[in-house]
Amino acid sequence: ILVGQELARALKIQAIFADKENDELVLKRGFTIRKGEKISVAEDVVTKGGRVQQTIDLVRSLGGDPVAVGIITDRSGGNVDFGIPLYSLIKLSLPTFDPAECPLCKEGKPLTRPGSGAKS
């Protein structure tokens, strides 16, 4: 949220954010998007790009015009394409593993899933 707020302040535009409800992103808190309003999507980290794509889809479904994605850390390895420009401050190449190939899984070590999408 902080990244988006500061981006909006620098661009002198409205800052809003989407909430997750029943596995879908929605606008709450009185936020609205005007038809044709240009929207820049901000995120802290992108690995597969699912949340960013959901946000772009939400903006379009509400009549907005997503024009760019700004992220702090790009972990995608260049494997995401949102159809609009993507800008990042850092590009990191970190290994990711399928569960069958994960060395920690093979050693029987428990895994945790950090982040805002984790369910407790």
Regions found by a protein language model. Name each.
Residues 32-71:
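A contiguous pocket-lining binding segment that forms or flanks enzyme active sites
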Residues 1-40, 47-50:
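Short, glycine/charge-rich flexible loops or terminal/linker lids adjacent to PRPP-binding catalytic cores
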Residues 56-120:
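PRPP-dependent phosphoribosyltransferase catalytic core
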Residues 30, 41, 99-103:
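Surface-exposed beta-strand edges and their flanking turn/coil or helix-capping segments
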Residues 14, 36-42, 88-92, 109-110:
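Short, structured secondary-structure boundary patches
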